[in-house]
């Protein structure tokens, strides 16, 4: 099981990035959440089988056609996360 906390920079807000990520995370059976940050970045938590999370990261690096992904900051997530869904969080 892989657990990653990521920050995505670039043109990733107001382009449907969170909804796109929600859809592909569900297709890949990856759990966690995604939300916009006040810094025009997108933050996400990804949990799932190593292969599924790795495939999702590759897709995130490309992003949807409306986005321009600049950089991905990836850190291992150490805390426990019990939800078995992928959610879009709103502030």
Regions found by a protein language model. Give the residues of each.
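Intrinsically disordered, low-complexity, mixed-charge
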Residues: 1-91
């Amino acid at each position: 099981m892989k657990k990653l906390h990521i920050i995505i920079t670039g043109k990733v807000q107001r382009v449907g990035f969170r909804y796109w990520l929600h859809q592909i995370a569900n297709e890949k059976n990856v759990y966690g959440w995604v939300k916009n940050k006040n810094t025009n970045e997108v933050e996400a938590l990804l949990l799932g089988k190593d292969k599924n999370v790795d495939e999702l990261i590759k897709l995130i690096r490309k992003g949807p056609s409306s986005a321009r992904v600049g950089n991905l900051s990836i850190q291992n997530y150490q805390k426990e996360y019990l939800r078995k869904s992928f959610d879009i969080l709103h502030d």
